[in-house]
Amino acid sequence: MKKSPLLLLALCAVFSAPCAARADDVALVEIKFDDGTIRQVTIEFYEKDAPGTVANFKKLAEKGFFKGCAFHRAIPTAIVQTGDPLSKKKDRTAVGTGGPGYTLAPEIRRRHTKGAVAAARIGDKVNPQRRSNGSQFYVCISPQPQLDGKYTVFGNVIRGLDVLESVSNRSADTNDYPIERILLKKVSIVPREKLSAPATAPKPGAPSEKKPLLRRLWPW
């Protein structure tokens, strides 16, 4: 049967519209604390600099992969890390080693400025290609220049960095795992225009800004 030009145009519109609408998506991350409090963080993506990593993050978010993942690493006013599916259980033995079952090609282009969101990975000795873990990610509460050129930065926190700083300051065990179970309740991908007001990224390098550095490079 011969399809009319109008039908073809309609089909093209149906299949291409979602892709066009997703060009400037953001992630709304709901974080649940032990006392039941829920706070929200908004992340923008670096689509051009890390397209593969961004696409993977969106895919996992839309599948509900991140729901229930705990923050399993927190360094005060420096970095917080989450995204390990093994952290959904209370057994902490293997937490930090999990993922979706695959790794991602490195897209190392951006710097670790304040608010940077980056993909975690295992160390260079066993991972000289610097491939990223498929789901674990961390957020820089303050600039971490010693990590530049080593990890894929794929986004930036534009709202709620204070929430993550609060997470980083919680009491933790000797492995930097917060004693309190702080969970990703939900990660949603939405068009930026649906945000209630314009969101702007925090200004890195403010004169009064404290810049604590990590005590060590972790074998992610």
Kindly give the residue locations of the regions a language model identified.
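Sec-dependent N-terminal signal peptides
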Residues: 5-14
